[in-house]
């Protein structure tokens, strides 16, 4: 019996490990996750003021590599036009749009976490509920007129 308890304790003490793309195991956060947390800490320490969010978001979009930059510029224009009540701000280093200081939606570049697509995500503040199951993030490979129309509808519903 004591031997069983010992094995259980050892199993509990082991930390979660994940395998990286190179086949190595690592503990904790990825470099991208740590960078996002550092950006969030800087955002929280930054002085607050009207208009600061818009300029910070536009500056962040300008830093993005293509095609994320063009997509970010277009999304910014779509979200501002569809929901003028949302305030742009940075959130974990990503362009985000908030109502009363709470993020409703955000844009994550493909480059941010080395994924094959960018993401338009919505928080629990967004009114997108549809029964017991609904999407809260959408993969973006390109923005055609069809995708733009869907985003307009999603953003309007999110703030309704």
Walk through the language-model features, giving the residues of each.
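Charge-dense, helix-prone N-terminal extensions
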Residues: 1-160
């Amino acid at each position: 019996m004591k031997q069983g308890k010992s094995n259980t304790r050892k199993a509990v003490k082991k930390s979660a490990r994940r395998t990286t793309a190179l086949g190595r195991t690592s503990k904790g956060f990825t470099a991208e996750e740590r960078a996002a947390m550092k950006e969030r800490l800087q955002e929280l320490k930054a002085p607050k003021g009207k208009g600061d969010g818009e300029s910070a978001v536009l500056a962040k979009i300008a830093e993005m590599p293509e095609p994320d930059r063009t997509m970010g510029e277009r999304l910014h224009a779509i979200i501002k036009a569809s929901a003028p009540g949302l305030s742009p701000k940075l959130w974990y280093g990503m362009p985000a749009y908030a109502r009363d200081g709470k993020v409703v939606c955000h844009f994550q570049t493909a480059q941010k976490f080395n994924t094959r697509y960018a993401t338009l995500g919505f928080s629990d503040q967004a009114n997108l509920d549809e029964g017991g199951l609904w999407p809260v993030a959408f993969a973006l490979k390109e923005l055609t007129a069809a995708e733009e129309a869907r985003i307009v509808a999603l953003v309007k519903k999110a703030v309704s």
